[in-house]
């Protein structure tokens, strides 16, 4: 379990009518599931939790008895076998078994080093590469419907072996009739219905967990799940991903060193898109960035920071999933970003506040940093403002005099 930050006093977090509230959310969960016919999926999720050592959490949520009455007998002895594994491994294995929605959730958590220690991040990062691809025959009916013909007829060449696979879609290489090398990104058949059902469950489970497990309240599980649900639903639209890519490409054009794949709209739909194939050094292969290969790591770092700051602070529209698999390094010390299924947006006010926070870091103004953070979090119960300000001052000391970019 992730330790609370020192400035959050869990004991001070109120538990208003906790039991009645938990009972309400539990009842709403079951009633909603019965209506949506999702009870079987709930039993599957909780069964996986039990097998991976989280049976106590199921009991504390008050769902074990209900499942047994519904005919699902939880096999508690299995939990002991997997309980010998480290908690991060248990969670990662559970997410993998639960399928695409939960794999995607874990992939997002891989970028939250502010919430999880390195041992957790290392396990979540494995989720980026542990998604099995579907055979091409499982994709053909959907492809014929979206492209109007077999992919071998639409393209001059189509590779039936996948180049990459992710939780929502998989990618195949192809060649247009004019010789352009492209990738064809294909949404997994049936994935939209699966994700929609899982999100209904997650929303209700988050509400129940927040009511029944007060130590989770500072982490705002309901808000986290709602934001995840909105983002994931948008990511299902592969044409929407391409619109995001074109917008960010236009914003990045003045820099001259950022590459965004071109979109081929004639073959792009909600369930399939076609973009330029990017041939470069993957973001995970830093050892390949040598002077002999024509790369300057310092320059790449500066350009990457410049691009990210421009997206966030100046443009207010940014790539929200920039893990190493979505970044490539190109000749001429250029940087390519791919996969714009997840983007973030910041209002002008938020951008101004973020700039205030960054300037507070480099100009050694801990009070300015604290003011922004407290404004963002609101008047949260249990926050020890004095201790928070002390820790921020110690943190700001590390960056005193460091250039912003």
Located regions from the model:
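Conserved ATP phosphate-binding architecture of protein kinases
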Residues: 170-176
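Conserved catalytic-loop position in the HRD/HxD motif
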Residues: 321-323
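N-terminal accessory/targeting segments that precede structured cores
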Residues: 24-170, 196-221
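ATP-binding glycine-rich loop module of kinase domains
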Residues: 177-234
